[in-house]
Amino acid sequence: MTVLPRIDPMLATPGRLPPLSSDGRYAYEVKQDGQRVIVYLPGDGTVGLRSRSGADITPAYPELGGLGGVLGGRPMVLDGEIVALDDAGRSDFERLQARMGLAGSPAKAARMARTVPAHLMFFDIVFLDGSSLVRAPYTERREALESLGLVGPHWSVPAAITGHGAQALETTRGAGLEGLIAKRLTSRYQPGVRSRSWIKIRLVRTVDVIVGGWVPGHGHLAGLPGALLMGRRDEDGSLRYVGSVGTGWSDTERVTLAGLLDAASVDTCPFTEPPPVTGARWALPRLVGEVRYTTRTRAGRLRHPSWHRLRPDLAPDDTN
């Protein structure tokens, strides 16, 4: 059996569409809203799934076990995203959250697989038949990926188009999708690197933040968070306050957040400079969330932030 190399996923840099003069030098793929995964197929019929952090999440997705038998004895390592699809066929992170974190509960994972099935979207291949492909250009890797015929009940290879980025972005907007990933055709695969060769183009501005505290709610929100206090890591590792967010979550999410914050409660402020907020309570800076916003102030605060989702798949160090 071939010993497969451990690969950290290559990451995209947030940005805008490439200029028209460079449009034809990029392939455009739909940005999926799920859990990044590196897939290990050693060629013996087994499957290994590792998250962006390197954690083994194979038991959480039993319906993907069939992958091990569809490609014969060819050893390979692939890159992709596990998603849960809504009724319109769009990736829905909120649905997927019911499946995440179940690697230690295989019986529950099997039950959830029947009600919230996972789908694995492949978009790259980095090792095949004993040879590393990380130094091969994107075009060669994509050709190798498409040649595998990875179409099944719980996996597929979404389309990629060369050029026509503006039209592709408008199509994703009309379909209610998050945006695009633009990949330079000549780009090599850079494990663990956030590369400018891949550009993440979102239709709304979002940012991952670290929750460092909260302000208790009042009235019917008594005992629940009224607003979360958000931070971002500076280069020296300190936590800088970037604003508070008090909208965007459902009643269920608010209750979930209350429990997480209560478990993370501490007496000391984790921010470099205490926020100018009355009645704040502090939390260990370990919860990561994603918020939407319109722009930033000169001081770096987020304007008009709205809560989008918890990011249990990210650690605080992954937010920069």
Task: List the predicted regions and their residue ranges.
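Catalytic cores of nucleic-acid ligases and guanylyltransferases
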Residues: 1-320
